[in-house]
């Protein structure tokens, strides 16, 4: 049976602490935003302890929410001047588009990479590039299906503009979807953000757009799967 590699000279742990550590390393932690939903499912199961259908429904709901709000650790690349995926999902667009007008930027198209998150994907968002948050703006809107091109213009969204140490601006936009009705963003103007750190979450299916500075070298293509904080989307100029 295959075993986890250990440093030379170290002795393997045994007993309950070892088992607990194995479980913790296998099951990803839960984002705090999901705890009320999981508690609701467990509460339903508790109320229906004498009814197997109610109990089963509650446990299934709690399990589904635990899976949806999972928050696995990620290791971003240590390469300089790269932009990583801000979310898990499928690259649904690689094109050029004007950034959200509420940011007050010139109305000129920039390279854009859009990632669509299904309900089965990890739904936390990661910082795509290290730098300072120079703008964080929420805009109310519609709740069209997030895989539609017009969703980036019409839907509720939250935009974060990040200025890198070399002066490049990268914009990451959380977009609500047909089912997603709640955008969570913890970043604030003036925050120093580290690449790969978790900064927000969108509940139940959504999309994340990343706008790049001119001259960036895009390294992904439409239809490709992306892993948040680890897949390199582009190299900055």
Curated annotation (Swiss-Prot):
What processes does the entry annotate via GO biological process terms? phosphatidylethanolamine biosynthetic process
Q: Which PANTHER family match?
A: ARCHAETIDYLSERINE DECARBOXYLASE PROENZYME-RELATED
Lineage, uppermost ranks: Bacteria, Bacillati, Actinomycetota, Actinomycetes, Mycobacteriales
Q: Name one GO cellular component term.
A: plasma membrane
Would you tell me the protein name for this molecule? Phosphatidylserine decarboxylase proenzyme
Compartment(s) of residence? Cell membrane
Entry cofactors: pyruvate
The free-text function statement in the UniProt record for this protein reads: Catalyzes the formation of phosphatidylethanolamine (PtdEtn) from phosphatidylserine (PtdSer).
Alphabetical list of Pfam families matching this protein: PS_Dcarbxylase
Q: Which domain of life is it from?
A: Bacteria
Return the cofactor note field: Binds 1 pyruvoyl group covalently per subunit.
Q: Which family does it belong to?
A: Belongs to the phosphatidylserine decarboxylase family. PSD-A subfamily.
Membrane topology is: Peripheral membrane protein
Residues carrying Pyruvic acid (Ser): 206
What about PTM?
Is synthesized initially as an inactive proenzyme. Formation of the active enzyme involves a self-maturation process in which the active site pyruvoyl group is generated from an internal serine residue via an autocatalytic post-translational modification. Two non-identical subunits are generated from the proenzyme in this reaction, and the pyruvate is formed at the N-terminus of the alpha chain, which is derived from the carboxyl end of the proenzyme.
| Recorded name of the encoding gene | psd
Q: Which UniProt keywords apply?
A: Cell membrane, Decarboxylase, Lipid biosynthesis, Lipid metabolism, Lyase, Membrane, Phospholipid biosynthesis, Phospholipid metabolism, Pyruvate, Zymogen
UniProt keyword Lipid biosynthesis present = yes
Q: Annotated site (Cleavage (non-hydrolytic)), which positions?
A: 205-206
């Amino acid at each position: 049976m295959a075993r986890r590699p250990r440093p030379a000279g170290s002795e393997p742990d045994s007993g309950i602490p070892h088992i607990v550590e194995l479980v913790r390393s296998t099951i990803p932690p839960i984002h705090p935003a999901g705890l009320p939903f999981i508690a609701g499912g467990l509460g339903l199961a508790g109320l229906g302890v004498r009814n197997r259908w109610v109990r089963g429904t509650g446990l299934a709901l709690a399990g589904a929410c635990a899976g949806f709000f999972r928050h696995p650790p990620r290791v971003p690349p240590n390469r300089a001047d790269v932009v990583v995926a801000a979310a898990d999902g499928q690259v649904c667009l690689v094109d050029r588009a004007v950034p959200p007008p509420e940011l007050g930027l010139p109305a000129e198209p920039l390279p854009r990479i859009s990632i669509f998150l299904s309900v089965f994907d990890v739904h936390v968002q990661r910082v795509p590039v290290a730098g300072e948050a120079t703008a964080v703006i929420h805009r109310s809107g519609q709740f069209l299906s997030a895989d539609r091109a017009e969703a980036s213009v019409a839907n509720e969204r939250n935009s974060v503009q990040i200025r890198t140490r070399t002066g490049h601006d990268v914009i990451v936009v959380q977009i609500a979807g047909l089912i997603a009705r709640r955008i969570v963003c913890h970043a604030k103007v003036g925050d120093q953000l580290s690449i790969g750190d978790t900064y927000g979450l969108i509940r139940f299916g959504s999309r994340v757009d990343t706008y790049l500075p001119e001259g960036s070298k895009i390294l992904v293509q439409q239809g490709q799967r992306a892993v948040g904080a680890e897949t390199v989307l582009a190299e900055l100029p």
